[in-house]
Regions:
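Histidine/acidic-residue-rich catalytic or RNA/ligand-binding cores of hydrolases
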Residues: 198, 226-230, 253-265
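P-loop/Walker A phosphate-binding loop and immediately adjacent motor/lid segment at beta-alpha junctions
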Residues: 174, 227-250
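Mature extracellular/periplasmic domains of secretome proteins
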Residues: 203-208, 231-236, 260-266
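Active-site mouth of glycoside hydrolases
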Residues: 1-214, 224, 247, 251-252, ...
Length: 272
């Protein structure tokens, strides 16, 4: 909301605001709403869900159905570091992946029968490390007080980064498919995921996206660099539907942003 709170921070005490925002989005012509679910709000232990949060999610799904909006359900959030349980950060890689699979199984079970689910986004901006990271340091640097980037491993060992990403995607998609065989699955990729010189996430779309139903990229065009943004976007067009899941005139003028959106239509099939 305008105070920077996540949905889970106020949907218990201020449900009227949630209903108001959904009605406003519908009037504005939106058809998909992206929601972010934090691990700390939905798991009380690696294998125990927060039933109260699941009930509130069901209420939100009913609201979406009634309003005529679809949900992009983005999970495994750790945006507020203070809300991340210590037990979660202390898990080994395999234990953490198992907890993440349990999370998604619980969420998908809640969503499976609803016509209001657009997709499951496995995680916002996951990254595979190069080499070995610091114990417990699963989050990337904060931006505006929130941690948007997460590591799915803390130790590359001798493994190709893309293979780690593929195995992680496989484990989580398999967990969802145990309880929901029909809704779409994707993952929100940073724009520096392409196989090219410089910073890379390890999630090369042409290598890791086989089990995803469509590709999502987060792309913020920069002033005077629209050609670069379109070239980057084109790199994510790998033969699957391509959605720009995040974009905004953060680094360019509104006029340039309009140009970017118009030009992106050649490659993208949706914008959130």
């Amino acid at each position: 909301d305008v105070e920077g709170r996540l949905l889970e921070d106020y949907w218990d005490a201020d449900w009227d605001k949630v209903e108001l925002h959904f009605a406003q989005m519908k009037r504005l012509g939106a058809n998909v709403v992206r929601i972010h679910l934090q691990v700390g709000k939905f798991l009380v232990a690696p294998d125990q869900p927060n039933e109260k949060s699941l009930e509130r999610l069901s209420k939100l799904i009913t609201l979406a159905e009634r309003t005529g909006l679809y949900l992009d359900v983005t999970g495994l959030g750790c945006y507020h570091k203070q809300d991340v349980p210590a037990w979660y950060d202390n898990l080994s890689e395999s234990e953490r992946w198992a907890a993440q699979a349990f999370f998604w199984r619980a969420i998908a079970r809640q969503c499976a029968n609803s016509p209001a689910i657009f997709c499951y986004d496995l995680m916002n901006e996951p990254v595979v490390p190069v080499g070995k990271g610091k114990t417990g340091a699963w989050l990337g640097p904060a931006f505006a007080g929130k941690h948007f980037v997460q590591y799915i491993s803390l130790d590359q060992q001798d493994r190709p980064r893309e293979e780690i990403a593929k195995k992680w995607i496989h484990q989580l998609t398999a967990a969802i498919r145990e309880v929901d065989q029909r809704h779409l699955i994707t993952v929100g990729l940073v724009d520096w995921s392409l196989d090219r010189p410089g910073l890379r996430s390890g999630f090369v779309p042409s290598v890791v996206c086989d089990e995803l139903d469509f590709v999502c990229v987060h792309l913020y065009p920069e002033k005077g660099k629209l050609d670069d943004a379109i070239t980057t976007l084109k790199g994510f067009a790998i033969g699957k539907p391509l959605v720009i899941e995040e974009t905004f005139p953060l680094k360019c003028s509104p006029q340039e942003f309009d140009q970017f959106l118009d030009r992106s239509r050649e490659h993208a099939t949706g914008w959130i």
